[in-house]
Amino acid sequence: MATLSVKPSRRFQLPDWHTNSYLLSTNAQLQRDASHQIRQEARVLRNETNNQTIWDEHDNRTRLVERIDTVNRWKEMLDKCLTDLDAEIDALTQMKESAEQNLQAKNLPLDVAIECLTLRESRRDIDVVKDPVEDELHKEVEVIEATKKALQQKVSQAFEQLCLLQEVQQQLNSDHRGKMETLEIDRGCLSLNLRSPNISLKVDPTRVPDGSTTLQQWDDFSRFNKDRAEAEMKAATELREATALTIAETNNELEAQRVATEFAFRKRLREMEKVYSELKWQEKNTLEEIAELQEDIRHLEEDLRTKLLSLKLSHTRLEARTYRPNVELCRDQAQYGLTDEVHQLEATIAALKQKLAQAQDALDALCKHLARLQADIACKANSMLLDTKCMDTRRKLTVPAERFVPEVDTFTRTTNSTLSPLKSCQLELA
């Protein structure tokens, strides 16, 4: 027998069903009315915003064009200013080089005099004296510097002005590069449109970047750079005109000073050669005396060794005779003779040691004095070498630099040749 299956769920009343249908129909009408209102407002908003967007884009495009024109005008002014600045730098550089060429004839004697003074600073010990040569060299430096002072001042001013011009040039180049980059960026912005492939949304594009300036600051900066460049170019032109001068010839004065200096060099070299020869003679005699004294010391040492062997023999004999038995241990003539021999040998050894000590003291004194002689000889050789180098260097004052070849042996002042071993040793000492 079949049974009725009833779904266990809530059962609504019929009025509830009618009410739900009415609410759905009413809400649908209300939603359509609201949607119609929104659609009308959206159409109005679209028209207004489209018009505003088109106008804003056109207005900003016009502003970009005007800004590009303004930046381009400043760029052209900077171009002209940079061209004039380059020309002025070249002109001032040429004038500076011309002034330096006028000093060239004085630079060589000055360099030679300073080189001689520097070389003579390598003198050692007692040879570091303030002699007439040093006085003449200092006087030579003073004479040369006096003739260079006025023109050197202009050269220094030209150098400083060139530094200022280059600083201005660097500033103008920086400003010019900035305007070139700005033109490239603004022209790129002007070329963009709605169909450009590289447009996208950015994060906070309306921010004000650090270091932003006002339009007035921008204009003042460019105008300041231009005005400063023009002022520096005017100063450079005046300096070029002031630098156009001549230096009075001082060849006679410089030649007279050169002759006086070289005369002092020759006189000083003759003095040192005389002293050097005397010291070498003393060294030779001292070396001979040292050799003889060393030979005598060797003989004394040999005698000491011989006497010591004799003393050992006597000691051994005496010691051996102390072992004689009983009454045989008597003080006989042999005992007295051996005892006297020991005493005599001890006295002899003491005398030889004393004389050996005196000889060694004398040898030490001779060696120390020889060292002092050789040190002074080395000083003299060094001083002669330095002054001869100075004389050789000063040949550049009378021989053109391109033809100058040192032809003097810096020790003997003869033509270059292979030095003997003795002279090579002397040079090493120097």
UniProtKB/Swiss-Prot annotation:
An example Gene Ontology biological process: flagellated sperm motility
Post-translational modification: Tyrosine phosphorylated. Ubiquitinated, leading to its degradation. Deubiquitinated by USP16, promoting its stability.
Annotated coiled-coil segments of the chain: 80-162, 225-382
Superkingdom as given in the UniProt entry: Eukaryota
Family annotation (Pfam families): Tektin
Gene Ontology CC annotations of this record: axonemal A tubule inner sheath; axonemal microtubule; microtubule cytoskeleton; microtubule organizing center; nucleus; sperm flagellum
Keywords (A to Z) from UniProt: Cell projection, Cilium, Cilium biogenesis/degradation, Coiled coil, Cytoplasm, Cytoskeleton, Flagellum, Microtubule, Phosphoprotein, Ubl conjugation
Xref: InterPro entries: Tektin-like, Tektins
Tissue specificity as recorded in UniProt: Expressed at high levels in testis, trachea and fetal lung, and at lower levels in ovary, pituitary, adult lung, fetal brain and fetal kidney.
Compartments, record wording: Cytoplasm, Cytoskeleton, Cilium axoneme; Cytoplasm, Cytoskeleton, Flagellum axoneme; Cytoplasm, Cytoskeleton, Microtubule organizing center
Matches recorded under PANTHER family: TEKTIN, TEKTIN-2
Subunit structure: Microtubule inner protein component of sperm flagellar doublet microtubules. May interact with CCDC172.
Function field: Microtubule inner protein (MIP) part of the dynein-decorated doublet microtubules (DMTs) in cilia and flagellar axoneme. Plays a key role in the assembly or attachment of the inner dynein arm to microtubules in sperm flagella and tracheal cilia. Forms filamentous polymers in the walls of ciliary and flagellar microtubules.
Family statement: Belongs to the tektin family.
Protein name: Tektin-2
UniProt organism field: Homo sapiens
Record gene name: TEKT2
